[in-house]
């Protein structure tokens, strides 16, 4: 099992709507994330910079890359596109973060 982190960017003024949509995450999306191997998934907001920091665990042999090919993931990205920075394909712009410290 490995832990990864990445950063995304929320548009200013979209905090409450972002939280509302995630509080009502579609069950089929949650199932797809779990089926891809994602667990212990957290997203934090830095309100000063509008950066979202995501941290999750995934096993060796995870299927996260295949999520982009699923209908539910594409629909979620389209649903969230008005709230955050996205690429030409509609997926959120993500920046991988380097681990600097870990205390177990």
From Swiss-Prot:
Q: What are the protein's UniProt keywords?
A: Carbohydrate metabolism, Cytoplasm, Isomerase, Rhamnose metabolism
According to its UniProt record, where is this protein located?
Cytoplasm
Kindly list the GO CC terms recorded for this protein: cytoplasm
Q: Does the keyword Nucleus apply?
A: no
UniProt pathway = Carbohydrate metabolism; L-rhamnose metabolism
Catalytic activities: alpha-L-rhamnose = beta-L-rhamnose
Instruction: Quote the catalytic residue positions.
Output: 22 (proton donor)
**What biological processes does GO assign it?**
rhamnose catabolic process
**Coiled-coil stretches:** none
**Please, which domain of life does this record's source organism belong to?**
Bacteria
Please give the Gene Ontology molecular function terms for this protein.
L-rhamnose mutarotase activity
**UniProt xrefs under PANTHER family:** L-RHAMNOSE MUTAROTASE (PTHR34389:SF2)
Q: What does this protein do?
A: Involved in the anomeric conversion of L-rhamnose.
How does this polypeptide assemble, per the annotation? Answer: Homodimer.
State what protein this is by name: L-rhamnose mutarotase
Protein species of origin: Burkholderia ambifaria (strain ATCC BAA-244 / DSM 16087 / CCUG 44356 / LMG 19182 / AMMD)
């Amino acid at each position: 099992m490995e832990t990864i982190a990445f950063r995304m960017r929320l548009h200013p003024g979209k905090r409450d709507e972002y939280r509302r949509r995630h509080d009502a995450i579609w069950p089929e999306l949650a199932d797809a994330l779990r089926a891809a191997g994602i667990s212990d998934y957290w997203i934090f907001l830095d309100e000063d910079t509008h950066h979202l920091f995501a941290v999750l665990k995934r096993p060796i042999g995870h299927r996260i890359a295949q999520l982009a090919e699923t209908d539910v993931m594409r629909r979620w990205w389209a649903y969230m596109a008005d709230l955050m920075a996205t690429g030409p394909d509609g997926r959120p712009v993500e920046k991988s973060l380097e681990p600097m410290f870990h205390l177990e």
